[in-house]
Curated annotation (Swiss-Prot):
Stretch list, region N-terminal domain: 1-92
Gene that produces this protein: nip7
Annotated family: Belongs to the NIP7 family.
Entries under SUPFAM superfamilies matching the protein: Pre-PUA domain, PUA domain-like
Organism from which the protein derives: Xenopus laevis (African clawed frog)
A Pfam match: pre-PUA_NIP7
Region of interest (C-terminal domain), residue spans: 93-180
Gene3D superfamilies linked to this entry: 3.10.450.220, PUA domain
Protein's name in the database: 60S ribosome subunit biogenesis protein NIP7 homolog
Subcellular location: Nucleus, Nucleolus
GO molecular function: RNA binding
Described function: Required for proper 34S pre-rRNA processing and 60S ribosome subunit assembly.
InterPro entries found in the cross-reference section: NIP7_N (IPR040598), Nip7_N_euk (IPR055359), PUA (IPR002478), PUA-like_sf (IPR015947), PUA_sf (IPR036974), Ribosomal_synth_fac_NIP7 (IPR016686), UPF0113_PUA (IPR005155)
Coiled coil spans: none
Principal location class: nucleus
Amino acid sequence: MRPLTDEETRAMFEKLSKYIGENIKLLVDRPDGTYCFRLHNDRVYYVSEKILKLATNIARDKLVSFGTCFGKFTKTQKFRLHVTALDYLAPYAKYKVWVKPGAEQSFLYGNHVLKSGLGRITENTSQYQGVVVYSMADVPLGFGVAAKSTQECRKLDPMAIVVFHQADVGEYIRHEDTLT
């Protein structure tokens, strides 16, 4: 477990800023304590200073997980967000997409969101912008990337892809053995 290097921090914050913009500072400067990001086994964990001090008493090879896993670095040093970060991304999301009840199950199985399943979309969402996907009851389901802008979505045919799937809460069941 170690602090992130400058390149790792930059890569992670660039990815997070696609979803929550300037609200990144709200993740670190919280009223309930100081939180930080730490790297362990190529995974980035979001952890309070209090838990971090307790985790230093455990040997590095015995430590499986601590805090909340936000994502991991690939072998090419690109940062990939995990679904475990959804609870922290959803309240601060700048761009949101709501899916109809019939399209929820399809999204939770790992499929993209089609125009026919789109309930609402935040105004001024640009193409390839990171979005958090919600059910119509405002329950966060996952996140993805907008395939089309808000303006283009109005003119699309029903079978066109609106949001590219990246992660969803169904991964807790599909990949339960690899999530830490």
